[in-house]
């Protein structure tokens, strides 16, 4: 369809935002080559650093460490930097962000229930018809679908949740799968929220009195891990998807889909993902991901 449209209008250049996956970029490259036209790829505004910038940063380094890339970006954009040094004298306050859920003195605020508009309801019906067996239950759908509403969710996080985000970001609770997590990543990933604006808003909360360990930990998730993993992806692809460092061969067990296992941590992580279509990074890293690593999957 795209090829036909380009020929019909005699276009000489195809301009696109940098795709999110290598396959799409390859397809666009092959298409424009076949048509004999130029391909102009613009940086993806959903990310702060470009694939080209990350490649330049990585060049010549024996090992690529997220922490060092994160520090480099902090300096570049002057985030939590005073007199060319990190605020608080440290780059990373993770040592303060591993508090047990048993130490929690207050329940997390109730998340406001979002009433879907007519268009969202129509889309939800289509999703149920086509993807009814996939993870997620539409009865639990509680996501904003406009920029204005996504910004309201960001403000709710900064006003009600960020103070406890840091200490309890690695904690898990059977009765509350989201705790003090921001739930903002989907909005950033689809372009409803600008990552740098969210980082600046978080930094502002620090100067208004929010704990540094919470603010720094939150910023690191976006400026550090999100940017670093994306950079690694584009640096290593297409070979990256077929790498198997540990040479593991076991397949995922059935309970990764059903949640039916006596291991309660795994069962609850899978069950909440099935219900919400969402899983925060500790569920993924320390439960399902860690199980897969230890089980040689």
Predicted ranges, named:
Residues 16-17, 172, 258:
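A generic structural signal for short
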Residues 4-5, 131, 159-161, 172-178, ...:
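Short amphipathic alpha-helical segments, especially helix-boundary/capping motifs
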Residues 23, 64, 68, 149, ...:
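Residues forming well-ordered secondary-structure scaffolds
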Residues 183-184, 188, 193-297:
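Active-site-proximal binding-pocket segments
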Residues 2-143:
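Beta-rich, aromatic/charged-enriched effector core domains that present basic-aromatic interfaces
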Residues 31-34, 157-160, 225, 272:
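Mid-sequence acidic-hydrophobic segments that form the walls
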Residues 77-218:
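Glycine/tryptophan-enriched, flexible segments
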């Amino acid at each position: 369809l795209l090829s036909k449209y380009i020929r019909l209008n005699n276009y000489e250049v195809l301009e696109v935002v940098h795709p999110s996956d290598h396959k799409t970029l390859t397809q666009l490259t092959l298409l424009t080559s076949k048509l004999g036209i130029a391909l102009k790829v613009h940086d993806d505004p959903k990310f702060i650093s470009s694939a080209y910038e990350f490649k330049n940063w990585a060049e010549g380094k024996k090992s690529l460490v997220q922490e060092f890339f994160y520090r480099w970006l902090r300096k570049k954009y002057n985030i939590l930097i005073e007199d060319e040094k990190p605020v608080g004298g440290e780059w990373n306050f993770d040592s303060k962000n591993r508090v047990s859920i048993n130490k929690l003195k207050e329940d997390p605020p109730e998340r406001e229930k979002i009433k879907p508009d007519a268009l969202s309801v129509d889309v939800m019906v289509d999703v149920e018809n086509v993807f009814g067996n996939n993870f997620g239950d539409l009865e639990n759908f509680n996501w904003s679908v406009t920029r204005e509403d996504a910004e309201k969710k960001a403000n709710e996080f900064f006003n009600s949740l960020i103070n406890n985000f840091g200490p309890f970001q690695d904690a898990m609770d059977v009765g509350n799968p989201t705790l003090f997590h921001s739930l903002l990543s989907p909005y950033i990933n689809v372009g409803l929220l600008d990552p740098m604006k969210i980082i600046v808003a978080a930094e502002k909360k620090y100067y208004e009195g929010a704990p540094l360990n919470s603010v720094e930990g939150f910023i690191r998730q976006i400026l550090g891990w999100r940017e670093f993993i994306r950079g690694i992806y584009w640096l290593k692809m297409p070979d990256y998807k077929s790498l198997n460092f540990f040479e593991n061969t076991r397949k995922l067990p059935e309970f990764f889909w059903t949640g039916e296992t006596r291991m309660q941590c795994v069962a609850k992580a899978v069950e909440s993902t099935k219900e919400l279509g969402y899983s925060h990074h500790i569920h993924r890293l320390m439960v399902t991901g860690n199980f897969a690593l230890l089980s040689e999957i």
